């Protein structure tokens, strides 16, 4: 599923996630998501008051409830998107694990970097992609092979850049569908979940936790609000 040019900020709730899917995905993807939920639902334990194992995993959990994130294109270069995204993830109260992925650097922000997603020490829930547009289809294929379930493609240079970009975006969508990866982007600000401390954006500040979920087609408007 490809959600084009979306910035999302949420305190995260199941009802919000369902509204996101209803708004962005369309009937075909909703049907696919319903089937995924049916397959992933664990049998109840028999005690509704303590039915922890009865939780239904939803297809957007990999984004809004991510516990591990790979930043593909993370770097220490000043004023770069890769540096800002990395800093936003590690400087906010996100309780998960963050892995920088960059084949040209041994470490980023003092954290060991890995050459590729396939070489990470564990599968990750979410990949945040900030590499040049021509590299993204291959990265999406690699993410699918590594079992990544959610991706945020911040990279620009797709449909908005002309015919070549249209073809690149089509390739990204094909790889995402093949790997059953939920995608926000490309050419987007990213996703914030203030309640969980996840700031997978290049925005200058983290939103405060609250009771409102916010989606914007415009990254500038999202940042301003």
Regions found by a protein language model. Give the residues of each.
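Charged/polar low-complexity intrinsically disordered segments
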Residues: 4, 21, 32-36
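Residue-identity detector for glycine
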Residues: 20, 26-27
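Catalytic-core regions of core metabolic enzymes
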Residues: 35-225
